[in-house]
Design a protein with these regions (language model features):
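Generic start-of-chain signal for non-secretory N-termini
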Residues: 1-26, 33
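Structured, non-catalytic alpha/beta "coupling" segments that mediate domain-domain communication
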Residues: 94, 107-108, 236-251, 260-285, ...
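Short, ordered loop/turn segments at secondary-structure junctions
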Residues: 44-46, 249, 332, 345-346, ...
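Single-stranded RNA-binding regions, centering on S1/OB-family and related RNA-binding modules
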Residues: 560-561, 565-727
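A glycine-rich phosphate-binding loop feature that marks nucleotide/adenosyl-phosphate handling sites
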Residues: 189-196, 330-334, 390-395, 416-423, ...
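Duplex nucleic acid-engaging cores and interfaces of nucleic-acid transaction enzymes
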Residues: 53-59, 66, 70-329, 333-436, ...
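Long, highly charged, low-complexity intrinsically disordered interaction regions
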Residues: 8-9, 68-86, 96, 432-530, ...
């Protein structure tokens, strides 16, 4: 692109993103163009961007991409129309002023290479002058419409009757009306503002469970459509159960078109022109606008569902690690038995087994399950049991709660979201890690490790398989995949990784690295022993200067040669960090001590900035790194809810106060695990006394919340909860 083109695109982005300062947008785009990654810019270039976070930087990147595509499309459309010899200064100016792709396409429509339409055939037969005469509004003093039509009769052109002539003119007028950008724009906005999305039942018999019952006779305004309802209606339509359409007051649209197209409403041609306008709307404009608006609604609903999925995944990835604990992972099942795997504090597998505590196993196997389970708890000094939340989860929870009461050591258990564990256990990564394990045994290991470090384990799985969202299989899979990859990348880099223990799947999400370099780091570690300096990364094959610059700050080395390597301070700032220490009367050996915390806390920040030349944000980050080396931001989050006993549905009574873990957040509320068979549902109206726009404003996946039982339906296995304090 030329400099002029780049400036036009830049101006469009600035106009679109008025919440950012122009200088911020320019700096972000320059940093991205130089090959810097989003996490690196967010963490280490705060002065340049004004402390924009990853989401804001990505928004600028995406809007710039859209503006670039828009500019290129405008150039292409102008070129095509110019080649046709039909480009006027006004049309060119209109195209150049367009801020949306839809507007460009509306302006281009009349000049598109069309298939041979009925209107085109009518023009070939010479009927354009007659159509123009009709639209000009002849009065009663003129020839009658029929008399004028007779002038165009032509056997050779297959215009044998007046009806043939009128039909041809009708097609021409209908196409002219359809191709006029201003008409489409007005009707689109009118429908967007006043239209209703209507769903009716098409095949109730196929809806055996009545999933779509509320949509059998349902309507909502296009302008106020609720995203999750749009996705539900789309799904019902896709399965053939519902018929979905957009309804609007057509009479007002017909009146608008007649007024615009008819130069003389009292003309003798008025009935013919009105009929052509109505036909143009019904055949061309209406269906096209319905498609556009339904696509628009679906895209908005997709974006909302993807946002919810992304937020839920982020909160799941950032669950606080349970450090230094020996954990037994239990993958529950009935017929095939519960698979057990014990991992030590580093995640290394110590033992694995299978027990059969549930029917249909015979009495002998069920009786043997308890002693075998307790022996494993005692032999390996297990402190925590992680139970997968899939099939047989609640029965397994009851079994575990009974067993841990009978052992001498104190053991707790937690229910772990096992979504995607089966996907992981059958993957190449799992086979490589545990070649001699059965699929279910790998799942048990994954469940145990999820409790120890959710992030390190979940990065091994396609994020779409984690299953915390709504309608994730109905939305654009490309957009969902891109968003979730971004969420994973952001989470990994916000937390950072231990260079000497991180797996290749975890390392490949570090800024600047890819799958090949991640594997090379692991191979280098295996061949040369643990890293004791970040500088050693320069010896890793394929890890060049740019990859080193982008990634090194996100990788930590505990117990290395330089304690700064165990902080999130970038090596480029090591000299400045040492200056800060000297100003506080400290040295490297003092990092992380109480003395350092006090001295750095009392440091005059203004003088420190003047002495070091550091910006406010970078100085702040350096002081934080020197105060708490090896800090894990997840440590500030509440630990998982640990239990020793179990509840049944029958134990629940309205008004009962409980603590639970938020398992999923959707548009209409949140699902909370309260330790009974079925997760309870807190409706959006029961989340807070204040107005709640979206449940994610109040709760997040993994939150520990206090809830009260609202009502229980034991027949349907449903528990309604409230977070509104009870009197």
């Amino acid at each position: 692109m030329t400099e002029t083109a780049q400036q036009i695109v830049m101006d469009l982005v600035k106009a679109e993103l008025s919440q950012f300062r122009p200088a911020q947008i320019e700096k972000v785009l320059k940093l991205l163009e130089e090959g810097n990654t989003v996490p690196f810019i967010a963490r280490y270039r705060k002065e340049a961007t004004g402390s924009l976070d990853e989401v804001e930087i990505r928004e600028i990147e995406e809007r710039h991409q859209y503006a670039t595509n828009l500019y290129k499309r405008k150039e292409e459309v102008i070129r095509i129309i110019e080649e046709q010899g039909k480009l006027t200064p006004k049309l060119k100016a209109d195209i150049e002023r367009a801020e949306k792709m839809q507007r460009v396409e509306d302006l281009y429509r009349p000049y598109k290479q069309k298939r041979r339409t009925k209107a085109a055939i009518a023009r070939e037969k010479g009927l354009a002058p007659f159509a123009e005469w009709l639209m000009n509004g002849p009065t009663s003093g003129s020839l009658s419409v029929e008399a004028k039509a007779k002038e165009f009769l032509n056997e050779e052109m297959e215009l044998s009757t007046i009806e043939d002539v009128l039909a041809g003119a009708h097609e021409i007028i209908a196409e002219i009306v359809s191709d006029e950008p201003a008409y489409r724009e007005h009707i689109r906005e009118f429908t967007r503002k006043n239209g209703q999305v209507v769903s009716t039942v098409k095949d109730a018999e196929s809806d055996e469970k009545g999933v779509f019952e509320m949509y059998y006779d349902f309507s909502q305004g296009v302008a106020t459509a609720v995203p999750h309802r749009i996705l539900a209606m789309n799904r019902g339509e896709k399965t053939g159960i519902l018929k979905v359409a957009i309804a609007v007051d057509e009479e007002k649209i017909f009146a608008y078109l007649s007024k615009k197209v008819l130069k003389n409403p009292n003309s003798i041609a008025a009935p013919y022109v009105k009929a052509a306008c109505e036909d143009s709307y019904r055949r061309f404009i209406g269906p096209a606008i319905e498609r556009e608006l339904r696509n628009e609604l679906t895209e908005a609903a997709d974006a909302q569902a993807i946002d919810v999925f992304g937020d839920n995944l982020r909160n799941l990835l950032l669950q606080p690690p349970l450090k230094g604990k020996v954990v037994l992972g239990l993958d529950p099942a009935y017929r095939t038995g519960c698979k057990l795997a014990i991992v030590d504090a580093t995640g290394k597998v110590l033992a694995k087994s299978v027990i059969y505590p549930h029917k249909p196993a015979n009495q002998e196997k069920r009786a043997a399950a308890g002693p075998a389970f307790r022996k494993m708890l005692q032999d390996y000094k297990v402190e925590m049991v992680a139970i997968g939340n899939g099939t047989a989860s609640r029965e397994s929870e009851l079994f575990v709660s009974e067993q841990i009461k009978q052992v001498l050591n104190t053991v707790y258990y937690a229910i772990v979201n096992e979504a995607g564990a089966s996907v992981y256990s059958a993957s190449d990564i799992a086979r490589e890690e545990f070649p001699d394990f059965q699929v279910e045994e790998r799942s048990a290991v994954s469940i145990a490790r999820r409790l120890q470090d959710s992030l390190a384990e979940l990065v091994k799985i396609d994020p779409k398989s984690v299953g915390v969202g709504q309608y994730q299989h109905d939305v654009s899979q490309k957009q969902l995949g891109e968003r979730l990859d971004f969420v994973v990348e952001t989470a990994v880099n916000q937390v950072g990784v231990n260079l000497n223990t991180a797996s290749a799947p975890l390392l490949q999400h570090v800024a600047g690295l890819n799958k090949t370099i991640a594997n090379n780091i692991v191979t280098f570690r295996e061949e040369n022993g643990a890293f004791d300096s970040r500088q050693q990364l320069k010896k890793v094959p394929r890890l060049g200067p740019k990859a080193f610059e982008q990634s090194v700050g996100f990788m930590r080395i505990a117990g290395g040669k330089n304690i700064l390597d165990n902080t999130d301070i970038h090596p480029e700032s090591y000299p400045a960090a040492k200056e800060v220490l000297a100003l506080a009367g400290l040295s490297l050996k003092d990092i992380g001590t109480e003395q350092a915390r006090e001295a750095l806390g009392a440091l005059d920040r203004t003088k420190a900035r003047e002495a070091t030349g550091l910006g406010k944000e970078t100085l702040q980050d350096i002081i934080a790194g020197l105060t708490k080396p090896g800090r894990d931001p997840r440590d500030d989050i509440a630990q998982p809810l640990l239990r020793q006993d179990v509840l049944s549905m029958e134990d629940l009574k309205p008004g009962m106060e409980l603590q639970g873990t938020v398992r999923n957040v959707v548009d209409f509320g949140a699902f909370v695990d309260i330790g009974v068979k079925q997760d309870g549902m807190v409706h959006i109206s029961k989340l807070s006394n204040r107005f709640v726009k979206h449940p994610s404003d109040v709760v997040a996946v993994g939150d520990i919340v206090t809830v009260w039982v609202d009502h229980v339906d034991t027949n349907k296995g449903r528990v309604a909860l409230t977070m509104l304090p009870q009197k």
